[in-house]
Amino acid sequence: MGSELKIENLNVKVSDKQVLFDLNLTVAGGQIHAIMGPNGSGKSTLASSILKKPGYEIISGSIFVEGTDITTMSPYEIAQQNMFVSGQYPLEIPGVTVIDLLSASSVVEKSEQEIQRIGESLSIPKDLLERGLNVELSGGERKRLDIFQLLVTMPKICVLDELDSGLDVDALEELAAKVYSLSKETSMTVLVITHYARILEILKPDKVHVLRGGKITKSGGFELATELEITGYDN
């Protein structure tokens, strides 16, 4: 059984403007949940708050990973909880490659050969793995590196913000299928944040939540995502 991700009464502000209001969400261990919503609804703010990205201030509320309160933890401490968060605009780190980062991680248990095979399975060129982390990369390249890190570290929980951004249809289907397979093989808990239902056709979420005005206003199964594609968020 995977680890539970629980968010209780989360209030977050960005640049002195409150964006999330008393947000509550529980993703049971091993489940896949999706958050959908219009632009400006607070979707990426939620991911950035979990990641503890600078500029996102948690006013009140708590975030728990398997019962452990991570609300005041640093990004490094959160990573030690075996949790992976992929943001829309990852930090660029010149001089530090993704291989350097993974080598320094205490949660990586794969051999060099296994890591190399994972890179090959994602069609990641060797020079990309040797480049500074997220430096001068396209949106698609960044997403491939995110999934590469995910497959190498095999976290208990992953949060993916706009995985479909910057990817063509074939690449999106390929990467989403790898996330789905890893979740089913390892009981990894997944929270995916997206605008579109297409990725959810592959991820087959247990639950879909609608985020509007900084609050979750509706929850349901995959059929909710299909409904939103037809009716939009105003109905």
Predicted regions and their residues:
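Q-loop/switch helix immediately C-terminal to the Walker
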Residues: 88-89, 94-114
